[in-house]
Design a protein with these regions (language model features):
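Double-stranded RNA-binding/processing signature
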Residues: 1-173
Length: 173
């Protein structure tokens, strides 16, 4: 077994550990591995076939919006569209997603390029928030909508509770 094969097996073991620690059901470990791979890492390893998490982030963002939108729609049947939009924006914003990602240690398991690593990428809000969305995309593809929804609602509970209390009109920008 050569060095790259050993490293690949070690990496997949790390990703399995991440999944187990966070109770993420996994059929296809490679999806979760991709979700935890930043563009900077993929760009530095062009000689290998490594996919970054941007496509999964795109999908995860859509699933996140749908799940939170559905939750708010059903939870607050008398709210007008504008109120639902403001509440959803507070729950799915990058800082909220980054906080969730930090709680389940996404930064520890991210594959980052050398520059991102040196500049504090493991704790950067944009990287963590994007990775949270990518993990959601991986969970959705690897399982189904219901599993992804449970994951999202469980991790966003703090922010959804704030909405229940009427505390959601924050400007995080």
């Amino acid at each position: 077994m050569n060095h790259s094969e050993i490293r690949r097996k070690e990496r997949l073991a790390e990703v399995r550990e991440f999944a187990e620690e966070n109770q993420i059901p996994v059929q296809n470990i490679q999806l979760l591995n991709t979700a935890l791979t930043h563009t900077s890492y993929a760009n530095e390893h062009k000689n290998e076939v490594i996919h970054d998490n941007e496509r999964l982030e795109f999908l995860g963002d859509a699933v996140l919006d749908l799940v939170v939108g559905e939750y708010l729609f059903l939870r607050f049947p008398s709210w007008p569209e504008g109120e639902l939009t403001r509440a959803k924006a507070s729950a799915v914003c990058k800082p909220a997603c980054a906080e969730c990602a930090a709680k389940f240690q996404v930064g520890k398991y991210m594959r980052l390029g050398k520059g991102e690593e040196l500049s504090g990428g493991r704790t950067r809000i944009s990287i963590l928030g994007d990775a949270f969305e990518a993990v959601i995309g991986a969970i959705y593809l690897d399982n189904n909508y219901e599993v992804a929804a449970r994951f999202i609602l469980g991790h966003l509970k703090k922010f959804l509770d704030l909405i229940d209390q009427g505390d959601y009109d924050h400007d995080y920008k």
